[in-house]
Amino acid sequence: MHSWQTTRFQIDLSRPRIMGIVNVTPDSFSDGGRHASASAALRHCEQLLREGADVLDIGGESTRPGSPPVPLAEELARVRPVLQGALKLGAPVSIDTCKPEVMAEALEMGVDIINDIWALRRGQAQAVVAAHPRCGVCLMHMHGEPATMQQAPMPGGPGEAVAAVADFLRERSQTLHALGVARERIVIDPGIGFGKTPEQNLALLARQRELLAATGAPLLAGWSRKSTLGLLLADEGQPPPAPGERISASVAAALIAVQRGAALVRVHDVAATAQALKVWAAVQALSGSQS
């Protein structure tokens, strides 16, 4: 599949696309509080687009490990003005939420994509999406729930985790398709860091093509500043570097994901990722003539 059908845009996936993260939260693991006001968040949206983002992913509830749920009214108050402004910027807009009520209001506003860490398993979420004629949807795998997921990650080894994630994403994709959601509207996300050990996360990257083969759907890779990268970077006996100090590792993971077939990468550091992908694309364009 070479495109992603969304509300207002048919996103061309013949080349990797960048989803820029816009956290309208005081407590996100990497940049909580930096863009908590609507004006700051909209300035950040504009900056990400200048840096090369293809999609804006706006969220009003942190999903970091251990994070508590945000009341519905508070989440809506956070994201509503940002969505209103972002929809005027001429780029696809995604709402990162697990609440059906937020999804429904966002879609009424004209939002292009629903990005749900619960893969539409809560309440009337899948009915909200199925009732919409065109919106895109990203289905993510998560073991457990954000408040406790890293206290009891997925059982089994790396290989068992890859198989379980593939089965889950296949089942969710098939369920939505049976409800009338066209395949070209669906993207999958293995959920790096959502109830998984570092070894399981790395296996999902190393064996990413198995997820693509299992579902036939485009894949969104979300490695940006994740704790697994911090553990890999930590010197012996030292704490991992802070999330903002994991940029090079995040770009490396994004490139590996793209090399293994990811259609989109969800990142905080758009400029660095866009530069790296330009180099990758230039080499890819010549690789056929040198084979």
Language model regions located:
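Catalytic domains of carbohydrate-active enzymes, especially glycoside hydrolases
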Residues: 43-59, 260
